[in-house]
Design a protein with these regions (language model features):
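Bacterial N-terminal signal peptides
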Residues: 10-19
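Short, conserved micro-motifs composed of acidic
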Residues: 24-301
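Bacterial N-terminal signal peptides that target proteins for export
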Residues: 1-10
Length: 301
């Protein structure tokens, strides 16, 4: 009996020792998941950790919280989150209350809400904005954002400023007509009372945390391909400068979209895909990041 007990104890010890490399080692350590900051040429963010660069793998819409300790992104049509703890970054965990095939996930500055676009009736193709809020035991069920977002068309390209004001794109209403474009929804008294159309022509707006500049996707003759990233600066009077192409260090022969600006405004995260608009569920896409110093006047950094 004693010999059998010793065998059991040895087996348990073996399992414990064997588990140390798996469970004892953190997923990643350090700011930005321990990644070396990029230069002026865009590079894949956290390859092998966040981005799986193999064909037909899809990561998109990477976004950090204001303190840099929470990172949200989409992988194969699901939304994931990883958080920086005293032991390092946790392994990405899927937010189970966020449905499959959601789009444009975006993290609030305090990391207590995740915003996204979703359609509960795919036959109508009416994608509307929702959010899930952090609770004591996980995340809430999706909640609509209020009557200001009631619309017969579809929303896309969601982004969020540090003050919870929303910037997003919406298509033309069902049946045609006006009403599409990039919109701004100011956050007032814990809600978004109205949407204001901006004089900008593009999609997938990505706003800086302090709303001082925006990067969006547009189709223009000077682009390297049909869709490129463009930068516009917000003037002191609230108007926007003419958007300019961000150039070949960022744009490529593929599709660039879904810009997200880091909390310190030093870096831009975006998604590059080899065929997002051709087949959005079977393409290859990765999250990239790039230093913005070359692109921003000193007063905007």
């Amino acid at each position: 009996m004693k010999q059998k007990m010793n065998q059991i104890l040895c087996f348990v010890a073996f399992l414990a020792i064997g588990s140390i490399p798996v469970f004892g080692k953190p997923f990643a350590v350090g700011p930005y998941l321990g990644q070396t900051p990029p230069g002026p040429i865009a590079q894949v963010f956290a390859p092998g950790l966040i981005c799986d660069t193999r064909p037909h793998q899809c990561e998109a819409f990477g976004h950090f919280s204001a303190d840099g300790n929470t990172f949200c992104f989409r992988r194969l049509e699901y939304v994931y989150i990883t958080e920086n703890t005293d032991q390092g970054w946790t392994r990405p965990e899927r937010i189970k209350s966020i449905p499959y095939r959601t789009g444009y996930c975006c993290l609030s500055a305090d990391a207590n809400s995740i915003y996204f676009v979703y359609s509960y009736d795919l036959s109508t193709k009416r994608y509307h904005p929702f959010r899930c809020q952090r609770t004591s035991d996980g995340w809430s069920d999706p909640q609509e954002l209020g009557p200001s977002f009631s619309y017969s068309g579809a929303y896309a390209g969601f982004s969020l400023a540090a003050n919870n004001s929303i910037y997003l794109f919406r298509s033309k209403p069902k049946g045609g007509g006006s009403g599409g474009g990039i919109f701004y929804a100011p956050y007032v008294n814990n809600t978004w009372p109205r949407l204001i159309k901006l004089p900008l022509f593009g999609t997938f707006p990505g706003i800086a945390p302090d709303e001082s500049f925006m990067v969006f996707t547009a189709i223009r003759p000077e682009g390297l391909v049909e869709t490129d990233l463009y930068l516009t600066l917000r003037r002191p009077d609230g108007t926007w400068t003419e958007a300019r192409n961000m150039g070949p260090k960022i744009n490529s022969g593929y599709f660039e979209f879904g810009a997200r600006i880091s909390p310190d405004k030093k870096y831009m995260f975006f998604t590059r895909s080899n065929g997002w608009f051709d087949n959005p569920y079977h393409d290859t896409s990765d999250i990239y990041w790039v230093d913005l110093k070359e692109h921003l006047p000193e007063s905007y950094r």
